[in-house]
């Protein structure tokens, strides 16, 4: 490893932490916890028209199933999501965004994409340096 490799790794981690800090602040400014924002994105991003299961959400967020159940309960109380039984498996609950959840996610996603666009040149430069080192 060269000194430049450590510098590139440190810069990459810095860019990740900077984006995560931005994301947490944006979620809080929208009246959500960062985990609630991530759950909204997971539900929408999993792109199943029937909704996402609690297990899907747990897997996407890298949390335990019972933690995902508690998160879904809190989000349902805030009317960010709706729940219904899976028509194919009555043991499973499917979760979908409500209009309120869709609106919150749309607003947050716009500003996140703007932030990523601003960070893209620095990230691309760092990623290119990693690719160059693997040749």
Regions found by a protein language model. Give the residues of each.
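Pre-recognition alpha-helix immediately N-terminal to the DNA-recognition helix
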Residues: 11, 38-42, 103
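Charged, amphipathic alpha-helical coiled-coil/dimerization segments
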Residues: 73-131
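Alpha-helical structural segments
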Residues: 14, 18, 60, 110-114, ...
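N-terminal helix-turn-helix DNA-binding core of bacterial DNA-binding proteins
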Residues: 21-64
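Short, hydrophobic-biased segments on the C-terminal half of alpha helices
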Residues: 54, 72-73
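Short, charged, intrinsically disordered terminal tails
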Residues: 49, 128-135
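N-terminal leader segment of winged-helix/HTH proteins
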Residues: 1-30, 78-80, 133-135
């Amino acid at each position: 490893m060269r000194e430049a490799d450590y510098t590139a790794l440190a810069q990459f981690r810095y860019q990740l932490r900077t984006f995560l800090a931005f994301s947490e602040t944006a979620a809080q400014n929208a009246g959500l916890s960062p985990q609630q924002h991530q759950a909204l994105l997971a539900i929408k991003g999993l792109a199943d028209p029937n909704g996402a299961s609690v297990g899907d959400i747990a897997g996407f967020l890298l949390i335990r199933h019972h933690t995902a159940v508690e998160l879904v309960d809190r989000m349902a109380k805030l009317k960010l999501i709706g729940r219904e039984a899976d028509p194919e498996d009555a043991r499973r609950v499917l979760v979908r965004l409500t209009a309120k959840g869709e609106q919150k996610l749309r607003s947050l996603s716009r500003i996140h994409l703007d932030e990523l666009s601003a960070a893209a040149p620095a990230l691309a430069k760092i990623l290119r340096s990693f690719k160059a080192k693997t040749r």
